[in-house]
A protein has these predicted regions:
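Mobile, glycine-enriched helix-loop/loop "lid" segments at the mouths of ligand-binding/catalytic clefts
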Residues: 1-19, 210-215, 318-340
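Short loop segments at secondary-structure junctions
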Residues: 2-3, 206-210, 297-300
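Conserved N-terminal alpha-helix of the aminotransferase class I/II PLP-enzyme fold
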Residues: 3-71, 75, 95-103
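A structural micro-motif recognizing beta-strand termini
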Residues: 42, 237, 296-300
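PLP-dependent enzyme catalytic core of the Aspartate aminotransferase-like
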Residues: 45-55, 85, 94, 102, ...
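Conserved PLP-enzyme active-site core in the AAT-like
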Residues: 49-264, 269
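Generic non-transmembrane alpha-helical segments
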Residues: 155, 254, 258-262, 306, ...
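Conserved C-terminal alpha-helix-loop-beta "cap" of PLP-dependent enzymes
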Residues: 267-357, 361
Length: 380
């Protein structure tokens, strides 16, 4: 049977079906359950509305909170895949990539393709009928390439593969993959949901029977569960998600416009710009361009390192860091930082060029960030 048939899809659900009181807190606690309900409402409010319209008291989506995003992905892979299956993934987070490749020792094949090319996804699915799970990020990191989630869902549905969307880069404010046909949605809560870099966390949302029955034994046995304190921190900070992301997106657009006209910048990648290659797709599935942008500085690796050296000083408003989603602006140079150990040919194949710089825009004033970017570029 297919992964979809093996795991099933329920018709009725509730976001917080937990074991009775008195059991170990690893199996659930009120603080974590509160965060589950909040994320459920953010990602699946359209399901709630539909249920209310037909006088149903129980929606169809369940949520579970993890100690990290990788805890969520690892537990998901163990629960969904078995020997002989394959995972089809795009250009994903490095640890996700490593995890999927590492599953080969258990007989699970990792297959990779360009998720921004629907025809390539279809060809990969046809070539690997044993795909149990399609896992994608949209936008991808750090290239910001967008996957057409709805089109891909039309490919996975008849083939019995589960479509999993890592919605970390967007958060529920900017994108709701369930509306577009995703079966499961995951988050690294560490990023935009927390928004303050104060906690690590992960989340997985999906059909209730899968989340609370088939999947729950893996959740409790793998043990990648959060502490109540981390759930409390994330439950507090998520309340400001909408105003934070709205402001961050607006600031990112201003910065992208500035960089687009700068003589030392070869190109700018920002989904909110009208000339972004996939602008039509962005308008269909995202609220705005988001808080992440990239730009290619002329001069290659040395120019990128010069910009990093400027922001490595303590008197600048940006922090040299590889994380994202904080109210503080983070800047990083993939070729000399996150992807320095990746062979240059592999970096180029992934769209990571020598002068590529990634910005995760925070809540500082746009004029301050633009001023310091200008100063940094003057040094290249």
């Amino acid at each position: 049977r297919s992964a979809r048939e093996r795991r099933g899809k329920s018709q009725r659900a509730a976001p917080g079906n937990r074991p009775p009181p008195g059991l170990p807190p690893r199996l659930g606690n009120p603080t974590t359950e509160y965060l589950e309900r909040v994320l459920f409402q953010l990602e699946a409010h359209h399901v709630i509305e539909k249920a209310l319209a037909v006088d149903e008291k129980e929606p169809t989506i369940g949520a579970l909170i993890f100690g990290s995003g990788m805890g969520a992905i690892s537990t998901l892979a163990l629960a969904v895949c078995r020997a002989g299956d394959a995972i089809l993934a795009g250009n994903v987070y490095g640890c996700t990539d490593s995890l999927f490749r590492g599953l080969g020792k258990f007989g699970v094949e990792a297959v990779f393709c360009d998720m921004g090319n629907v025809a390539a996804v279809e060809a990969a699915l046809d070539a690997h009928p044993n795909v149990a799970m399609v896992f994608l990020e949209s936008p991808e990191n750090p290239t910001l390439r967008i996957a057409d989630i709805e089109a891909i869902s039309r490919l996975t549905e008849p083939r019995g593969a589960l479509l999993v969307v890592d919605n970390t880069f967007c958060s529920p404010y900017l994108q709701q993959p369930f509306r577009l046909g995703a079966d499961l949605v995951m988050h690294s809560l560490t990023k935009f949901v927390n928004g303050h870099s104060t906690s690590i966390g992960g989340a997985l949302l999906g059909p209730f029977r899968f989340m609370k029955t088939d999947f729950f034994p893996w959740y409790k046995d793998v043990g990648a569960t959060p502490s109540p304190f981390d759930s409390w921190l994330n439950g507090m900070t998520v309340q400001s998600l909408a105003p934070r992301e709205a402001q961050q997106s607006a600031t990112a657009l201003e910065i992208a416009r500035f960089l687009s006209t700068h003589p030392k910048v070869a190109s700018v990648g920002y989904p909110g710009l009208p000339d972004f290659p996939q602008a039509d797709l962005v308008r269909r599935q995202m609220r705005s361009g988001g808080a992440i942008l990239t730009f290619e500085v002329k001069g290659g690796v040395s120019a990128g390192e010069a910009v990093m050296n400027y922001f490595g000083r303590k008197d600048t408003p940006m922090e040299l860091a590889v994380s994202l989603g904080s109210c503080i602006t983070y800047i990083q140079h993939p070729a000399s930082m996150t992807h320095a150990v990746v062979p240059e040919a592999d970096r180029l194949a992934r769209g990571i060029t020598p002068g590529l710089i990634r910005l995760s825009v925070g809540l500082e004033g746009a004029e301050v960030l633009v001023e310091h970017l200008g100063r940094a570029l003057d040094l290249t």
